Amino acid sequence: MTESNILLTGKPGIGKTTVIKRTVELLSCSSTGFYTREIKRGDPRVGFEIISLQTGERLPLAHTDFTTAEDRVGKYGVKAENLLGFLKEINEAMTSNKPQCLVIDEIGKMEFFTPGFHETVDKAFQSSYPLLATIMKKSHKFCDYLKNRGDTDVIEVTENNRDDLPEKLAKRIEEQL
């Protein structure tokens, strides 16, 4: 069986998001979902923003300035509600008949605060569409469940493979459509 779900994992800063973005650029089909990018103020990282692959819309997900946020991961306050519109795009894509790749960057602690996140991710894994996602490396009940699915291939991004992965992944995704 060909694994239709691809999970990229690896150390922070190794290039998982870069692999996602380059893979999406190589695809001839459309992609629906989002990727996450660091927000920097000078050199230090002060937060993360989420960017829609469909519309280019950008919203902050977590920031050191979100001091009153109830949800927190380390020094970052999390605005989980900012992810809701991006989840809606993925849910709508799963009801269409359009050939496409679903993209979720990232399945991790900050995103878990968003109502409906677990359900949308689970539906994406069960859908007929190829899924390309990044996932936290550390053990977590939901993440371990996803990593151990029979229809999922977990690939660790390293300095040795990160430059070659986008072309290989794009070819594999195109073959599934």
Swiss-Prot record:
Keywords in alphabetical order: ATP-binding, Hydrolase, Nucleotide-binding
Molecular function GO labels: ATP binding; ribonucleoside triphosphate phosphatase activity
Reactions accelerated catalytically: a ribonucleoside 5'-triphosphate + H2O = a ribonucleoside 5'-diphosphate + phosphate + H(+)
Source domain of life: Bacteria
InterPro entries associated with the record: Nuc-triphosphatase_THEP1, P-loop_NTPase
Positions that bind ATP: 10-17, 101-108
EC identifiers of the protein: 3.6.1.15
Pfam families noted in UniProt: NTPase_1
Enzyme class at the top of the EC tree: hydrolase
Function: Has nucleotide phosphatase activity towards ATP, GTP, CTP, TTP and UTP. May hydrolyze nucleoside diphosphates with lower efficiency.
Protein family according to the UniProt entry: Belongs to the THEP1 NTPase family.
Protein name per Swiss-Prot or TrEMBL: Nucleoside-triphosphatase THEP1
Organism (species): Natranaerobius thermophilus (strain ATCC BAA-1301 / DSM 18059 / JW/NM-WN-LF)
Higher taxonomy: Bacteria, Bacillati, Bacillota, Clostridia, Natranaerobiales
